Amino acid sequence: MSEIKDVIVQGLWKNNSALVQLLGLCPLLAVTSTATNALGLGLATTLVLTLTNLTISTLRHWTPAEIRIPIYVMIIASVVSAVQMLINAYAFGLYQSLGIFIPLIVTNCIVVGRAEAFAAKKGPALSALDGFSIGMGATCAMFVLGSLREIIGNGTLFDGADALLGSWAKVLRVEIFHTDSPFLLAMLPPGAFIGLGLMLAGKYLIDEKMKKRRTEAVAERALPNGETGNV
């Protein structure tokens, strides 16, 4: 159970692919102009990570070490092609919005990295969980960045959600404030870099605060009974 918990915590927070490893920045910065686009690409990446980790882990004993990377890429490309066709069939509006960034998941360092670092060494169940956790960590980072950029740039949230979730999702669109013209800095790549930088700073501050609390808790437990640690 502790290993399962560690895999989940590492994927979602401690080893977050976007905020710690800084992998997959090209789609992260390019696609997150809206929360819907960010969520769509994040979920697609999560599905690819989960399926490729599961497949590669299952076949790891029959994969020659000398040609393992080409085999990994072939497996990843097959899964990405299937996911791309699913999005094209059932969410065509999202397919048009994401464009080239769906097939580019094949070359995403996150996917290949987890295949080599984790799936090739662990069992199928744990590898699938690792892929799902890493994918959801990246999805959360993309969604937060996309939401911030959409709110600041357009004053809306979940604009175009029907392209991802169907016609019923039109009710999810929220207008935070009205604007006649978008704030282009937030919508263009410079806004993505600024937003990502703020998120990195926020994660650092949270980690430092949590580390300080743990240190104080350990120090209090180490004190003899009746002492408070104050001079």
From Swiss-Prot:
<keyword id="KW-0472">Membrane</keyword>
<keyword id="KW-0249">Electron transport</keyword>
<keyword id="KW-0812">Transmembrane</keyword>
<keyword id="KW-0813">Transport</keyword>
<dbReference type="GO" id="GO:0022900">
    <property type="term" value="P:electron transport chain"/>
</dbReference>
<protein>
    <recommendedName>
        <fullName>Ion-translocating oxidoreductase complex subunit E</fullName>
        <ecNumber>7.-.-.-</ecNumber>
    </recommendedName>
</protein>
<feature type="transmembrane region" description="Helical">
    <location>
        <begin position="63"/>
        <end position="83"/>
    </location>
</feature>
<feature type="transmembrane region" description="Helical">
    <location>
        <begin position="18"/>
        <end position="38"/>
    </location>
</feature>
<dbReference type="InterPro" id="IPR010968">
    <property type="entry name" value="RnfE"/>
</dbReference>
<dbReference type="InterPro" id="IPR003667">
    <property type="entry name" value="NqrDE/RnfAE"/>
</dbReference>
<feature type="transmembrane region" description="Helical">
    <location>
        <begin position="182"/>
        <end position="202"/>
    </location>
</feature>
<feature type="transmembrane region" description="Helical">
    <location>
        <begin position="125"/>
        <end position="145"/>
    </location>
</feature>
<feature type="transmembrane region" description="Helical">
    <location>
        <begin position="39"/>
        <end position="59"/>
    </location>
</feature>
<dbReference type="GO" id="GO:0005886">
    <property type="term" value="C:plasma membrane"/>
</dbReference>
<keyword id="KW-0997">Cell inner membrane</keyword>
<keyword id="KW-1278">Translocase</keyword>
<feature type="transmembrane region" description="Helical">
    <location>
        <begin position="86"/>
        <end position="106"/>
    </location>
</feature>
<comment type="subunit">
    <text>The complex is composed of six subunits: RsxA, RsxB, RsxC, RsxD, RsxE and RsxG.</text>
</comment>
<keyword id="KW-1133">Transmembrane helix</keyword>
<dbReference type="Pfam" id="PF02508">
    <property type="entry name" value="Rnf-Nqr"/>
</dbReference>
<comment type="similarity">
    <text>Belongs to the NqrDE/RnfAE family.</text>
</comment>
<keyword id="KW-1003">Cell membrane</keyword>
<comment type="function">
    <text>Part of a membrane-bound complex that couples electron transfer with translocation of ions across the membrane. Required to maintain the reduced state of SoxR.</text>
</comment>
